[in-house]
Structure formats: C-alpha cells, structure tokens
Amino acid sequence: MISSSAREDIVQWRVPVAIRIGYGPIELVQGPAEACRYLADRWPFLGGTYHDLAESGCRAAMSRRASVEEARSVFISAAQEACLLD
C-alpha cells in the first residue's frame, strides 16, 4: 500500500517550474507536494497574497480537490511575487 505522502508526491506538473532562490542555482519544482515544501521551508518570506493562495492551491491539488495545473499557475504567481523567476 502506498502511503498518503507517497501518493502526494506522485502528482506532478506536466512542465516543472524553474525558480532561483537568492543567488543560488535554478531549481526545478516538479509538482504541488514539492511546491508546498518550498513555500514552507525555502521561501524568502512567508505570507503575501499569492504565497497563501499557492499553499492552499497546492494542498488542494495533492488531495485531488483542485486542478494540478491551477496549482501550478498560482505557484508561478507566488514565485513572481517573491521575485524567484528569471
């Protein structure tokens, strides 16, 4: 049996989102579970309109309550808000 956290990691985006935190290398975020980890642990600041929407959207996509691509779109908006896109 696959655990719920393993199932959450199976949900992937068709196209990963490339972000850069600070002066670090470009990192590819593959799906909503990974995006949630970035939003919670690696984001330059917590809060913000799109940060909060991305967190809830990614959680909803992981539990199949929302579209995976909608979660990707709001994650991209959060990355733009945090100046993480090149």
Model regions and ranges:
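Short, compact, well-ordered microdomains
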Residues: 53-86
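Short secondary-structure boundary micro-motifs
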Residues: 1-3, 27, 44, 67-68
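Generic secondary-structure microfeatures
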Residues: 5, 21-23, 79
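Homeobox/homeodomain signature
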Residues: 7-9, 29, 52, 58
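Short, charged/polar N-terminal "headpieces" of proteins
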Residues: 1-16
